[in-house]
Amino acid sequence: YILDVASGTTQTVLTRLSRQQHATPFEAAERVVAQRQTEADEFYASLLGVDRMSEDQRRIHRQALAGLLWSKQFYHFEVEEWLDGDAAAPAPPESRKRGRNADWRHLHNLDIVSMPDTWEYPWYAAWDLAFHCIPLALVDPDFAKAQLVLLLREWYLHPNGQLPAYEWNFSAVNPPVHAWAALRVFRIDRKRTGRGDTLFLKRVFHKLLLNFTWWVNRKDPEGNNIFEGGFLGLDNIGVFDRSK
């Protein structure tokens, strides 16, 4: 569509996806759009705590949730192929096989994942994702639970129990918030639906034990609880080098 939009004016384009031809495809367009708007308003009005918010707070709350939903993205990254190179392209430098992410050959990303931002940060980060899942549990608890399970699957979680941190360096260390997020999502879902998804807890528990064992053995062998309070530091800049 080529449209000339004058200053202070708007233009509207209606499209419809259908398996069959319609003689009047947009006959009920205004009614359908209005109905969907009403349904969306009713859904967001039913969310936990909305009744205690001001109108401005409800608007901010809804826009924030919309931003989270908008930040779902298909993410495809085969680490092994990146390390070895594509057969149809020039081979990468040998140093790549000894550099960052060289220990993550098992990692196969081919999923819809919640991103920090699909424009500025179009890659997942394990601890960002854990935080995303808590508000997502209000609007799509099944997706929130599936995201937490995804990072614990055998093609994501390292055999030693480490969660993949983020694309630039999957071996980086982020605060251990995955178990906390799983419990929070479980409780939010239980409060919303009236039933607790214990199967979800069972699915994540064993893998979280592996992750906890990695923390204890690799990051705190002296038993100093170094990954508790203060681990993050300021704006993801720790007071010590947490990758060593």
List PLM regions with ranges.
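Short glycine/serine- and small hydrophobic-enriched flexible loop segments
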Residues: 134-137, 180-190
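Short Pro-Gly-centered flexible turn/kink motifs
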Residues: 3-19
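Active-site acid/base region of carbohydrate-active enzymes
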Residues: 69, 77-99, 103-104, 138-139, ...
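Solvent-exposed loop and edge beta-strand segments that line ligand/cofactor-binding
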Residues: 113-129, 163-175, 244
